[in-house]
């Protein structure tokens, strides 16, 4: 059976992430994954209090990649990342990480509510009541697929086509691109 663990990296566990990878290796785990706090729901406050800045994130990912390589493990990075801010997943060997909401994945809740991603705060329709085309072409979905929530600072950046501006729920991106309003407004 293949098992993949996922660790949300925070100030509380960043220093021990490589140790966690070693511990998991000792249990026979071959695949580990990690992400950052997502700016949705309680994650907004948590990211302010416990989120890693770009320098710390790059350091912990670099160390984690090195540890996983030494142990012959696969490390996956799930968070869409703004490369210009200092953490380039391609440079770390983690591949292109861009927002895949409404493009490669959507979330359908038990009542049929459709979200562009599992963390998106607002519905784009209901799979039990709405035509798929109205959900797929919902203005929020179209903006997400076009990476139109990215900040002005991202436009013309050398990484623009690779990262797409990172996660549109990221508070810094949302604030820059939406004048402080929520990403879906």
Enumerate the predicted regions with their spans.
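Flexible mid-to-C-terminal extensions adjoining Fe-S/redox cofactors in radical SAM and related proteins
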Residues: 89-90, 96, 114, 119-185
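Radical SAM enzyme [4Fe-4S]-AdoMet core and its adjacent flexible, acidic
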Residues: 1-119, 123-124
């Amino acid at each position: 059976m293949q098992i993949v663990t996922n660790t949300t990296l925070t100030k509380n566990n960043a220093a021990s992430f490589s140790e966690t990878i070693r511990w998991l290796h000792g249990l026979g785990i071959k695949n580990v994954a990690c992400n950052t706090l997502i700016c949705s729901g309680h994650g907004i406050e948590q990211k302010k209090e416990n989120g890693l800045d770009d320098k710390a994130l790059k350091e912990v990912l670099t160390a984690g990649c090195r540890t996983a390589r030494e142990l012959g493990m696969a490390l996956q990075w799930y968070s869409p990342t703004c490369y210009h801010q200092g953490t380039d997943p391609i440079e770390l060997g983690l591949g292109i990480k861009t927002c895949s909401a409404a493009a490669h994945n959507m979330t359908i809740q038990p009542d049929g509510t459709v979200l562009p991603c599992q963390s998106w705060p607002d519905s784009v329709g209901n799979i039990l009541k709405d035509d798929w085309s109205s959900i797929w072409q919902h203005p929020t979905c179209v903006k997400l697929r076009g990476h139109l929530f990215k900040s002005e600072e991202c436009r013309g950046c050398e990484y623009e086509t690779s990262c797409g501006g990172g996660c549109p729920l990221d508070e810094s991106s949302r604030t820059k691109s939406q004048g402080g309003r929520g990403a879906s407004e």
